[in-house]
Amino acid sequence: MLADRIAERAAALAERRGNTVAVIVVDLREISADISSALVSQLVTPRLQQAISALGEADGIIASTPVYKAGPSGLFTSFFDVLDNDLLIAKPVVLAATAGTARHALVADDQMRPLFAYLRTMTVPTSVFAAPEDWADPALNTRIDRAATELVLLMESGFARQVRDESWQSYQHELGSAGGTELAIDLDTDLMRLATGGAAG
């Protein structure tokens, strides 16, 4: 519900600014078994791959979770645990959380923000939190508007694309990752030919 409200504001703002927006919802409850399986087997099912691809192709992300045991849901963190570390580099992200009490208001900034910093995303400055008493509070709408505006402006700037185009090779990538740095290795050298059993030129 909170993510939907942020997405609606972001889409409306983007359209007012002359952009066409398609909102794709990834409901982790529908792929919970796929996420659990991937954690223990490293095998990604087609349904999970579809969700991962949706994030990889998105211009921006709204990452929203309920709070359980004073932290993001285990399903939420497990999903991001199975992602390629390079998938979301420089991707604009809004962090959002809901809980049954305002005592968990800092979960988005204290616990979610470090996770997305590790994934090297571009999280917007404003996170959004809602407890039951917040839904009718105009202050929540103000934060939603602010976060949506920050997201749209980052998406419009093409920041993520520019980072990939201009400085992708300066990031540390793992073999076989979305970074694909192994493809930059020159295989047509004497050393590589010798390593593969061929003769040096």
Where are the language model's segments positioned?
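Residue-level signal for beta-strand positions within conserved beta-sheet cores that form or flank
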Residues: N19-V21, I89, V124
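N-terminal beta1-alpha1-beta2 submodule of the flavodoxin-like/Rossmannoid cofactor-binding fold
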Residues: M1-T77, T181-G201
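Hydrophobic alpha-helical membrane-association signature
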Residues: L2-I6, A108, A147
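Helix-loop-strand module that forms the ligand-binding subsite of alpha/beta enzymes
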Residues: L43-R120
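Glycine-rich phosphate/pyrophosphate-binding loop and the adjoining helix
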Residues: F129-G201
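Generic secondary-structure signature for well-ordered alpha-helical cores
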Residues: E8-R16, A117, T121, T149-A160
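Charge-dense, low-complexity intrinsically disordered segments
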Residues: A38, Q42-T45, A102, D134, ...
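Mobile beta-alpha loop/short-helix "lid" or hinge segments that flank ligand
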Residues: I24-A33, A117-W135
